[in-house]
């Protein structure tokens, strides 16, 4: 999401793309004064690209069509991941749990994603995670350790 947003900001800045509220919100957050300054921060590794996703959600909630398109594309990608999982597991009766603030918290993106899942994959049940991410990582590490001959 962040990478696509920065691409949109770059295109808006040099005239290859439409103006977007993402530019204004990012300028305000970075106190940069210009899209060129933001691009310099990206190239100098002084900008956490993933953090830009929250700005995209904010812009979408304000009705910015570029932000809405970015989130729509990314929600489609997550639905495609679920479809791939359905194919690999040969079942469409799955529970799906979200992890991460972008989709855990109620916002434009999480609502859009849930709506897309419900409309395209009606047998999928969205559930709360049984464990926090760290708990899941520990459980996975324990399973991997056991499978390679370690003590579990």
Model regions and ranges:
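ATP-binding/phosphotransfer module of carbohydrate and carboxylate kinases, centering on a glycine-rich
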Residues: 6-152
């Amino acid at each position: 999401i962040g990478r696509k947003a920065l691409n949109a900001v770059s295109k808006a800045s040099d005239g290859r793309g439409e103006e977007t509220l993402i530019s204004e919100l990012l300028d305000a957050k970075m106190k940069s004064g210009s899209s060129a300054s933001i691009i310099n921060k990206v190239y100098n590794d002084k900008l956490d690209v993933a953090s830009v996703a929250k700005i995209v959600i904010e812009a979408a909630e304000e009705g910015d069509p570029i932000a809405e398109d970015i989130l729509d594309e990314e929600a489609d990608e997550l639905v495609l991941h679920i479809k791939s999982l359905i194919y690999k597991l040969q079942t469409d009766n799955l529970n799906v749990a979200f992890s991460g603030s972008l989709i855990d918290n109620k916002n434009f993106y999480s609502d859009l994603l849930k709506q897309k899942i419900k409309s395209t994959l009606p047998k999928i049940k969205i559930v709360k995670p049984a464990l926090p991410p760290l708990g899941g990582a520990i459980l996975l590490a324990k399973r991997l350790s056991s499978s390679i001959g370690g003590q579990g």
